[in-house]
Each structure stands twice: as C-alpha cells, then as structure tokens.
Amino acid sequence: MVQRSKSSANWLREHFNDPFVKQAQKDGYRSRASYKLLEIQEKDRLIRPGMSVIDLGAAPGGWSQVTSRLIGGQGRLIASDILEMDSIPDVTFIQGDFTQDEVLQQILQAVGDSHVDLVISDMAPNMSGTPAVDMPRAMFLCELALDLATRVLKPGGDFLIKIFQGEGFDMYLKDVRSKFDKVQMRKPSSSRDRSREQYLLGKGFKGA
C-alpha cells in the first residue's frame, strides 16, 4: 500500500508539472493526448474539412475535439469508448465495450452504407504492469480496430492507431502493410519518453 501511494504521488506530481497538461487546460482540450494528434496532423495532414472519421477509445474526448474542429460542420465524427464522455457538438458518441459485438454493430449502424475516410484509435487496456498480460490485451484491441477499419474505410482511406512494442507487434505490422499502401511509425514529442507507446499510421487503404 505504501508503494502504491508513493507511485500515485509521483504520478500526480508528474501530471501537474507536465507542460502538455498545463497547455491542454489553457487551450481548452480535455486531455494532453490532443497534442499527440495535433503533432501527427501537422506532419501528415490526415484530417481535412468534410471528412468522415471514427474515433475509438475517445474518452475523455481530446482527439474528438481536435478532429471535430478540423473536419468542420460538413464532416462526420463517430466516437466510441467504454467510458462516459461529455458531449461534443456534432459528434455521435457510442458508449460501450468495443470488444462486444453489440457495440461494434452500433458503430457499423452509425456508419451506414457510406464508408469513412479515416479511423483513429487511442485505445489502450487497463495496464497491470505485467507485459505478459498487458501486451496480449493491447494487441487484441489493435486487431479489433484494424478489423473494423477494413470494414468501414473507403479505398484510399487512412488508419492511425496507438500500439506498443512487444510480442505480436511484428505480425501486426505485417498485417497492416498488406492492407495499406504506406505504413509509418510516429512517436509524438507529447508522448512521454518512458512510455512504450507509438502510433502506427497506415495510408491508402487497398480496399476490402
């Protein structure tokens, strides 16, 4: 218990001293994660006015805020998370466990017959600190997100997902490369140095 309290205190200290946390509060973003997407956007120009986008693992809404602003009123954004998320204007939010078929069907129903231009995912499982447990959970979410992307993306569409280096990564990378014309890795400066997270970007979906 003492160790946990010490760890929690260290996290809180790091959190409140984090310049991106302070900047998010100043800019009105719900989380520091907004700057990860903004940095990737600055480099890759993924999000454009009028696009249709799916945001997985959306809560508390940092990526949805950025995306909604960039796609504008003519765009369409469907966001989903197992956690609650305060509403964002013009964003369709589906709360539920993405690994459950019922929630997946709700997302597919919201997409309808018109496919989307971009699928983004900042999903991560609750980490136990044990890689042998955490990596399979993380890769399972990545695999489900890729499966959804291949069902809803237009040919030429793009896919951005948080991923962790470890067991299963190389096979997943190979799978994404088979489905997209170009695959790149991104590590935004706003991603903490000690974090093993990276972002995998697949551009130019080859079609189902």
UniProtKB/Swiss-Prot annotation:
Its EC number is 2.1.1.166. One of its GO terms (cellular component) is cytoplasm. It is an enzyme of class 2 (transferase). Keywords: Cytoplasm, Methyltransferase, rRNA processing, S-adenosyl-L-methionine, Transferase. It comes from the Bacteria. It is found in: Cytoplasm. It catalyses: uridine(2552) in 23S rRNA + S-adenosyl-L-methionine = 2'-O-methyluridine(2552) in 23S rRNA + S-adenosyl-L-homocysteine + H(+). One of its GO terms (molecular function) is rRNA (uridine-2'-O-)-methyltransferase activity. S-adenosyl-L-methionine binds at G61, W63, D81, D97, D122. It holds the Pfam family FtsJ. Coiled coil: none annotated. Belongs to the class I-like SAM-binding methyltransferase superfamily. RNA methyltransferase RlmE family. Specifically methylates the uridine in position 2552 of 23S rRNA at the 2'-O position of the ribose in the fully assembled 50S ribosomal subunit. This is Ribosomal RNA large subunit methyltransferase E. It comes from Pseudomonas entomophila (strain L48). The gene is rlmE.
